[in-house]
């Protein structure tokens, strides 16, 4: 389901995965096999979920890597759409004409 203004996926990691377990960022980073700085950047919205991180999150907290990457994609698209007036494009063709 697409959200108009989705939260940064790092916020979801913090609020829905790390905090309910009573983990510190350092403890969660150790369990995920990443540096404290890498996880801190993610949960504070300074970094996104990479394919590798999506696998780590999937193994640690469940769900699938695709779900984690989907959250990241929705967030990234929503951020890009906030500046669509800055994106200048001339239409080339419609999708159905290209896919044939």
Model-found features: residue ranges?
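A short, Lys/Arg-rich alpha-helix, primarily the initiator
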Residues: 1-23, 70
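Hydrophobic side chains within well-formed alpha-helices
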Residues: 9, 64-65
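Short alpha-helical DNA-recognition segment
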Residues: 22-41
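The DNA-recognition helices of helix-turn-helix-type DNA-binding domains
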Residues: 35, 46, 61, 72-75
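DNA-binding alpha-helical recognition surfaces that contact promoter or target DNA
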Residues: 41, 55, 70
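Short, basic-rich loop-to-helix N-cap that marks the start of a DNA-contacting helix
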Residues: 46-59
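Short, charged recognition helix plus adjacent turn
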Residues: 69-100
């Amino acid at each position: 389901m697409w959200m108009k203004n989705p939260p940064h996926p790092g916020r979801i990691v913090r609020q829905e995965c790390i905090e309910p377990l009573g983990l510190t960022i350092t403890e969660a980073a150790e369990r995920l096999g990443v540096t404290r700085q890498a996880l801190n950047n993610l949960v504070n919205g300074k970094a996104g979920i990479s394919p590798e991180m999506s696998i780590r999150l999937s193994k640690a907290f469940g769900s699938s890597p695709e779900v984690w990457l989907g959250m990241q994609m929705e967030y990234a698209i929503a951020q890009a759409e906030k500046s669509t007036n800055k994106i200048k494009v001339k239409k080339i063709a419609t999708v159905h004409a290209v896919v044939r």
